């Protein structure tokens, strides 16, 4: 019995060690309606042996009732989980699925293709490293294909695989494949996507999805799964700009005061000179503390506690950065804004803007233009409606430390919260600061009030008192 327990323990340890060393790729699938997004994900799960027997039996049964593939098992039903999705044969919600191979772990976001669900797609794409854009070989590059590509570019996704699907319906024609490739690359010249790859597939038949197909001898590339396993995403991490939004002031006893949070970009080590923003106070890193003990260096995306050599005033929402590499610090910024509420965006209405751990009141001071996501044309607008995207000027009541979104996604993004309903109504990406408004005036507090407020925040951080010197 003891021998069996030991073997079981060794198997568990071996399994954990194997998966611990794998890196993870987050990707989304997007494309026009009925291009086969859900079928492709079902094929990836099926061919990578990630479907249990009871799941396969269930979708085999459902295929006879609501399937769209005739006598074959409708693999899209693995992903289209909502009853309304199955009955209509479309994807509405963002469906997340997880699978792994010997080389890598994956999280898939299957996003809806309809224009009225743009906000769902933006939500699914916001954390992804790569996008698979499906193009129906029968119809080529459509308006929806261009819209999804624009959104992928807007959200800073650097890797795109254009999967030209349903090649079986076009007799695996090389001419069709090359024409679509040419059309897409011509359109993509307007976008900021540095890495674009192409693959001809049939999600229904499995051609070039996991294994290389004999039906496309003219294609000298690798199958889709091999692309996903081998694409390099480590270089996308920003290791240059150290940014550490403070989540919590950790003070377990009178002898220890640290600042807990996650390194969202860059790296830091004891001895590095840092600046706390927005106060501008400087110090040096004393320790990098983790659950497993002190570390010589902290990297993105580690969660750590930093201690400093000096007792400077830092609270939740502040950002610790290296003194020789400062972010933008201002009260006004030009941004891209995706509106997600059925109530239209009204300029000069008070909203709450949340950056990482910092929340600050503010307004949309001006809508520069609205971007037509289908044609990329810009037009004047008085307000933004649900699923519309615009370039807007935002103004906050206090300075905010952030970076342009294209340089640093974690510190260049924010969400907009309705102060009345507490619902998320928008998502934004910083383009740049608006010069000439870096000045900030504070209400007149007495010296005693300022000192007392600092004392309370230092010794009772769990009270979450507001720093009145920043009001």
Curated annotation (Swiss-Prot):
EC assignment: 2.7.7.4
GO biological process: hydrogen sulfide biosynthetic process; sulfate assimilation
Coiled coil regions, renumbered to chain: none
Region of interest (G4), residue spans: 165-168
Taxonomic source organism: Alteromonas mediterranea (strain DSM 17117 / CIP 110805 / LMG 28347 / Deep ecotype)
Name used for this protein in its record: Sulfate adenylyltransferase subunit 1
Domain (tr-type G) ranges: 22-239
Region G5, residue ranges: 202-204
Similarity remark: Belongs to the TRAFAC class translation factor GTPase superfamily. Classic translation factor GTPase family. CysN/NodQ subfamily.
Record region (G1): 31-38
């Amino acid at each position: 019995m003891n021998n069996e327990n030991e073997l079981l323990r060794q198997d568990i340890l071996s399994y954990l060690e194997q998966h611990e060393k794998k890196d993870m790729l987050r990707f989304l699938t997007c494309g026009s309606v009925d291009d086969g997004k859900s079928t492709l994900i079902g094929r990836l799960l099926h061919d990578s042996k990630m479907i249990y027997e009871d799941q396969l039996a269930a979708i085999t049964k459902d295929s006879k009732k609501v399937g769209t593939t005739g006598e074959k098992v409708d693999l899209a039903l693995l992903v289209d989980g909502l009853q309304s999705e199955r009955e209509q044969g479309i994807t509405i919600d963002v469906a997340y699925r997880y699978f792994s191979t010997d080389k890598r772990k994956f999280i898939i976001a299957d996003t809806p293709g309809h224009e009225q669900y743009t906000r769902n797609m933006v939500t699914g794409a916001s954390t992804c490293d790569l996008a698979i854009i499906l193009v129906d070989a029968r119809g080529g590059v459509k308006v929806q294909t261009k819209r999804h590509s624009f959104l992928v570019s807007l959200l800073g996704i650097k890797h795109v695989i254009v999967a030209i699907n349903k090649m079986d319906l076009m007799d695996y024609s090389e001419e069709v494949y090359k024409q679509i490739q040419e059309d897409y690359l011509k359109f993509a010249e307007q976008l900021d996507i540095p890495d674009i790859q192409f693959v001809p597939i049939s999600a229904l038949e499995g051609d070039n999805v996991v294994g290389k197909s004999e039906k496309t001898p003219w294609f000298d590339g690798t199958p889709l799964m091999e692309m996903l396993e081998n694409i390099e995403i480590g270089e996308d991490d920003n290791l240059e700009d150290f940014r550490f939004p403070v989540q919590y002031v950790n003070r377990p006893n009178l002898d220890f005061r640290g600042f807990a949070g996650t390194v969202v970009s860059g790296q830091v080590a004891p001895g590095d000179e840092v600046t706390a923003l927005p106060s501008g106070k400087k110090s040096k890193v004393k320790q990098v503390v983790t659950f497993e003990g002190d570390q010589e260096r902290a990297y993105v995306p580690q969660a750590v506690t930093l201690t400093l050599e000096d007792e400077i005033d830092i609270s939740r929402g502040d950002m610790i950065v290296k003194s020789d590499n400062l972010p933008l610090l201002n009260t006004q910024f030009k941004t891209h804004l995706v509106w997600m509420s059925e109530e239209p965006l009204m300029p000069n209405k008070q909203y709450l803007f949340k950056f990482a751990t910092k929340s600050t009141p503010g307004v949309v001071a001006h809508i520069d233009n609205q971007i037509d996501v289908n044609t990329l044309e810009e037009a004047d607008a008085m307000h933004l409606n649900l699923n519309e995207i615009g370039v807007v000027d935002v103004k906050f009541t206090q300075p905010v430390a952030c970076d342009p979104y294209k340089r640093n996604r974690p510190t260049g993004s924010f969400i907009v919260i309705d102060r009345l309903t507490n619902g998320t109504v928008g998502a934004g990406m910083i383009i740049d600061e608006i010069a000439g408004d870096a000045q900030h005036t504070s209400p007149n507090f007495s010296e005693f009030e300022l000192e007392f407020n600092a004392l309370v925040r230092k010794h009772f951080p769990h009270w979450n008192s507001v720093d009145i010197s920043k009001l």
